[in-house]
């Protein structure tokens, strides 16, 4: 609903950046607080966003989901 209106009612009290969704502000606030709630179970790494943890886990699993467009290497 707010996607195309430009409305951003959620403002960061630290840097005044504005967001369309409250959960985007919540995630952004972790940059200011240093909170990293997502922990790797294989090493000491911690992450602000779960998507970053999922991407990091590929280091441990050896998963290489993207192939080179030129030689098909992964």
Curated annotation (Swiss-Prot):
Major site of localization recorded for this protein: nucleus
Gene3D superfamilies: Classic Zinc Finger (3.30.160.60)
Organism: Psychoda cinerea
GO molecular function (one): zinc ion binding
Location in or out of the cell: Nucleus
PANTHER family named among the record's database cross-references: MYONEURIN (PTHR24394:SF29), ZINC FINGER PROTEIN (PTHR24394)
Keywords, in A-Z order: Developmental protein, DNA-binding, Gap protein, Metal-binding, Nucleus, Repeat, Zinc, Zinc-finger
Similarity comment: family membership: Belongs to the krueppel C2H2-type zinc-finger protein family.
Function: Krueppel is a gap class segmentation protein.
Pfam families: zf-C2H2
Zinc finger (C2H2-type): 1-4, 10-32, 38-60, 66-74
Cellular component, GO, one term: nucleus
GO biological process: segmentation
InterPro entries reported in the protein's UniProt record: Znf_C2H2_sf, Znf_C2H2_type
Name the UniProt record assigns to this protein: Protein krueppel
């Amino acid at each position: 609903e707010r996607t195309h209106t430009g409305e951003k009612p959620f403002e960061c009290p630290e840097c005044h950046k504005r967001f369309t969704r409250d959960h985007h502000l919540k995630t952004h606030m972790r940059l200011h607080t240093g909170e990293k709630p997502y922990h790797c179970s294989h090493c000491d790494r911690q992450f602000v966003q779960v998507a970053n943890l999922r991407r990091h886990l590929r280091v441990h699993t050896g998963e290489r989901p993207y192939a080179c467009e030129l030689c098909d290497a992964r």
